[in-house]
Amino acid sequence: MKNLAQAVAISLIALIAISCKSTKETASSCTNVESSVKWTPQTEPQILASIERTACYGRCPMYKTTFMDNGEVTYVGKGFVDKIGTYKTLISEEDVQFIKSNIIEYDYFDLDSLYPTPITDFPSSITEVNLNGKRKKVINRRTPPTNLKDFEKFLDSILKGKELQKVSDETNYDTKAK
């Protein structure tokens, strides 16, 4: 009986020792794996700039172009434009940098947020910019300063000569094309 008790005690001690060693090795190997894998956060592309031309009582072009900081561009033509629907293209890194430098050159962040008009028939040009953590939206109804008019013309000119791929017939600016 004494031998049986000793055998059980030795077996129990051996099992405990083996299980402790196994746990230590597992914990240590997990730590090594975690320390060898470097996590790099993935960021979603951010809107860099956009321009929207709104309706009037006549035949005013209605569209919105959105430029992302990774070069993706989405154009949504709504009415009185050659391309109706949602289109996409890519612009070069140089074009993205040119947009950024023009935001600064045209003093976009110094503009007023609204250039109003009491006349209801006038279309609006709505520009938005997001640069270095600063965001600004400007609604131009009629009497903007020269630098805002020039910035709007600049944004409109970027897609000239670019090949746009139609991705849907959707004309809602707030819906992301798939």
Give the residues covered by each predicted segment.
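A short, structured loop/turn motif at beta-sheet edges
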Residues: 69-70, 90-98, 129-135
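An acidic/histidine-cluster motif and surrounding catalytic segment
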Residues: 60
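Sec-dependent bacterial lipoprotein signal peptides
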Residues: 1-18
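A short, structured beta-strand/loop element
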Residues: 65-75, 121-123
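Short, well-ordered, aromatic-rich surface patches in folded extracellular/luminal domains
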Residues: 3-5, 20-57, 109-178
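A mature extracytoplasmic/lumenal domain signature
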Residues: 71, 79, 103, 131-133, ...
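Short amphipathic beta-strand/extended segments with alternating polar/hydrophobic composition
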Residues: 66, 86-91, 134-143
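A short-motif feature that recognizes glycine-rich, charge-decorated loops
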Residues: 75-110
